[in-house]
């Protein structure tokens, strides 16, 4: 996708968590190692938006059973995503975490000289993918969405072995696929609000398989990686 001066990387929770909810220590170590190598060889800056993952869903499901309303449940998910981001910040910088709570906070942290910002969600009613799209729009950056499949498929590749990877797809085509409920395994990752932001701002978006984490940084370097470009 061309070497990126400023990139936003959305890390899906499926990459960070085991099925039972524990963090994948090996993956986090590998991601941070690749990130350090990328920064050492480039002038790039990166905003890492971390999802809540299984841990957030556990809290949300418990809260729902306890009668908590959906807006408050969203906020619980945001807090968990920020805790995930704080853990990665602490491991990367070995200092108390500075986690943005607004878009302005992101700008301030980058202006202070930080080359990497770690963050979770920003507000209820918004997925962390939408958050990542808004950050990319605000910073005029590119967006990489890292998930557990190689991109967007014609059907769910985990259920349909005949599904094929789409190398390019337009926002309008994705909208039609949403209406047919055929966005292969991506409903949880690319929602309609995210598509609205991508379309209005013409953000460059590439969806790829984030495991191994080297895939993400190969894409940031402009190397060819399997995945899907979303065209506004």
From Swiss-Prot:
<keyword id="KW-0067">ATP-binding</keyword>
<feature type="binding site">
    <location>
        <position position="57"/>
    </location>
    <ligand>
        <name>ATP</name>
    </ligand>
</feature>
<keyword id="KW-0418">Kinase</keyword>
<dbReference type="InterPro" id="IPR011818">
    <property type="entry name" value="Uridylate_kinase_arch/spir"/>
</dbReference>
<dbReference type="Pfam" id="PF00696">
    <property type="entry name" value="AA_kinase"/>
</dbReference>
<keyword id="KW-0963">Cytoplasm</keyword>
<dbReference type="InterPro" id="IPR001048">
    <property type="entry name" value="Asp/Glu/Uridylate_kinase"/>
</dbReference>
<dbReference type="GO" id="GO:0005737">
    <property type="term" value="C:cytoplasm"/>
</dbReference>
<feature type="binding site">
    <location>
        <position position="156"/>
    </location>
    <ligand>
        <name>ATP</name>
    </ligand>
</feature>
<keyword id="KW-0808">Transferase</keyword>
<dbReference type="GO" id="GO:0044210">
    <property type="term" value="P:'de novo' CTP biosynthetic process"/>
</dbReference>
<dbReference type="GO" id="GO:0033862">
    <property type="term" value="F:UMP kinase activity"/>
</dbReference>
<feature type="binding site">
    <location>
        <position position="74"/>
    </location>
    <ligand>
        <name>UMP</name>
    </ligand>
</feature>
<comment type="pathway">
    <text>Pyrimidine metabolism; CTP biosynthesis via de novo pathway; UDP from UMP (UMPK route): step 1/1.</text>
</comment>
<dbReference type="GO" id="GO:0005524">
    <property type="term" value="F:ATP binding"/>
</dbReference>
<feature type="binding site">
    <location>
        <position position="53"/>
    </location>
    <ligand>
        <name>ATP</name>
    </ligand>
</feature>
<dbReference type="InterPro" id="IPR036393">
    <property type="entry name" value="AceGlu_kinase-like_sf"/>
</dbReference>
<keyword id="KW-0547">Nucleotide-binding</keyword>
<dbReference type="GO" id="GO:0006225">
    <property type="term" value="P:UDP biosynthetic process"/>
</dbReference>
<feature type="binding site">
    <location>
        <position position="147"/>
    </location>
    <ligand>
        <name>ATP</name>
    </ligand>
</feature>
<dbReference type="InterPro" id="IPR011817">
    <property type="entry name" value="Uridylate_kinase"/>
</dbReference>
<keyword id="KW-0665">Pyrimidine biosynthesis</keyword>
<feature type="binding site">
    <location>
        <begin position="13"/>
        <end position="14"/>
    </location>
    <ligand>
        <name>ATP</name>
    </ligand>
</feature>
<feature type="binding site">
    <location>
        <position position="52"/>
    </location>
    <ligand>
        <name>UMP</name>
    </ligand>
</feature>
<protein>
    <recommendedName>
        <fullName>Uridylate kinase</fullName>
        <ecNumber>2.7.4.22</ecNumber>
    </recommendedName>
</protein>
<feature type="binding site">
    <location>
        <position position="153"/>
    </location>
    <ligand>
        <name>ATP</name>
    </ligand>
</feature>
<feature type="binding site">
    <location>
        <begin position="122"/>
        <end position="128"/>
    </location>
    <ligand>
        <name>UMP</name>
    </ligand>
</feature>
<comment type="subunit">
    <text>Homohexamer.</text>
</comment>
<comment type="function">
    <text>Catalyzes the reversible phosphorylation of UMP to UDP.</text>
</comment>
<comment type="similarity">
    <text>Belongs to the UMP kinase family.</text>
</comment>
